[in-house]
Regions:
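Solvent-exposed soluble domains appended to multi-pass membrane proteins
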Residues: 1-181
Length: 181
């Protein structure tokens, strides 16, 4: 299995939007569709591999393009009016795990738009699309501990001594890191 063509992102693509390590996934996929269409017209059978960068550590710049909220939503009883109020605590804002979740949301949107664009171009007929990750997100167990044990009422993280504490042991931590499945 060899490659007949290789498209270099900084030579064959217009770097019109960068996020993190390079060209944004949305721009990359948008620009890839005409290239795929050309290859599809020239070849009866072909294989292509596309590498996404936006959902790659260190997840920098993602706040600029993702509106995904990494907050803890909860209801608090208001004794004055007897109603429950919707509250929000931005407990993962500014954390690596929060940025990772935002980048996953962005990647999901980019892949969804890519699939729509491929379908609109008639490129999904007789096609198999495989999506996989090549490694985990490199998130420390302490970040997951905050995720599973955040207390919005005290704006703190539960400890092992607190009721309701969820231990993020080695098994559970590694289970969340297993890639691709």
């Amino acid at each position: 299995l060899g490659y007949d063509d290789f498209f270099n992102y900084n030579k064959d693509f217009n770097i019109d939007e960068t996020i993190g390590l390079g060209l944004s996934d949305k721009s990359f996929f948008r620009q890839a569709v005409p290239k795929i269409d050309k290859i599809n017209k020239e070849h009866d059978k072909w294989y292509g591999a596309f590498l996404m960068l936006t959902n790659h550590t260190p997840f920098t710049d993602i706040e600029r393009v993702s509106d995904y909220e990494v907050d803890f939503k909860y209801k608090m009883y208001n004794e004055e009016d007897g109603m429950y109020e919707e509250k929000s605590a931005p407990f993962l804002e500014g954390t690596k795990l929060g940025s990772y979740f935002k980048s996953v949301h962005y990647a999901d949107q980019a892949i969804g738009q890519f699939m729509t664009d491929l379908d609109n171009a008639g490129l999904l007929d007789n096609t198999v699309v495989v999506i996989y990750g090549d490694h985990d997100a490199k998130i420390k167990a302490e970040e997951y501990d905050r995720y599973f044990n955040y207390n919005p009422f005290t704006d703190s993280v539960l400890t092992e001594d607190d009721e309701g504490y969820v231990p993020v042991d080695d098994f559970y931590y590694n289970l969340n890191r297993k890639v691709p499945f």
